[in-house]
Amino acid sequence: MTHQKVENNLQHQPQISKYEKFEIIYKKLKHIFIGFFTILTCTLIILLVITVFYFQSITKESEHISDNTLRLKLLNIPGTQDINYSNQHILSEYNQSLNPLIVGPKNVNKNIIKALTASEDSLFYRHNGILPKALLRAVGQDLFNTDAATGGSTITQQLVKNQVLTNEKTYDRKANELVLSMRAETLLTKDEIIYTYLNIVPFGRDYNGANISGISSASYSLFGKPPSEINIAESAYLIGLLQSPYYYTPYQEDGVLKPDDQIQIGINRQHYVLKRMLVEKKITQHEFNQSEKFDIKKHLMTK
């Protein structure tokens, strides 16, 4: 009798439908997801706050540099006597300089600028001094200790590194480089940045074995003519040297030309620059084909 009552009670209990079961599971999963998302969000906020404070602590060096001091440091070209760096029209100073190794827009063939921006910083005229994506890629390769070239530094960053900071590979130096690069973009025009960079950057060695810096010195030393007369092939070759000047230079320490197989390394780099110029539509297919046929070794200066 008792057993029969229990069965009757069970039969009269409301049955849970599939929909109700699904709703119960859904609510539980929803609470778990909200809890997980809340914890994740709080963790990210904490990490962001820590990162901001850490970044501020390691960029104090850049905060102590005034705008005027930073501008003068960025523009300073060692060994120049006739440049008035306080002149707000610094490109005019470069154009009118009595020193043939200091050049401005009127003294530099536009192919050099095209080669430089196409191969080293294709977004130069659009960014504000840094490229977040390239920077993250560089950091990732640094963390995983890979040797592949990242292209993480813009021309502005390279100017800051050469003129204001050192070449040491520390996170402090890199952080200050980022801050100063963004400030540099507010103090100088794009043309002031790129022509100053071309006037100070190292290009390896000349045919006497001496170290050379600046596009004018490189143009005279390698091809025996001013940068205003450099053709597309020569422009690509000179700019190709910038990634690793003493590796790609065609000259040995005594100024003698390297063996053909070593000179070819620099020519291969030149072909890369030409391809980048074609991809970025800085040159036509015909100009690319003609430049690839140009005999660089035949035109190099020798003793």
Give the residues covered by each predicted segment:
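Juxtamembrane regions of bacterial inner-membrane/periplasmic proteins
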Residues: 2-303
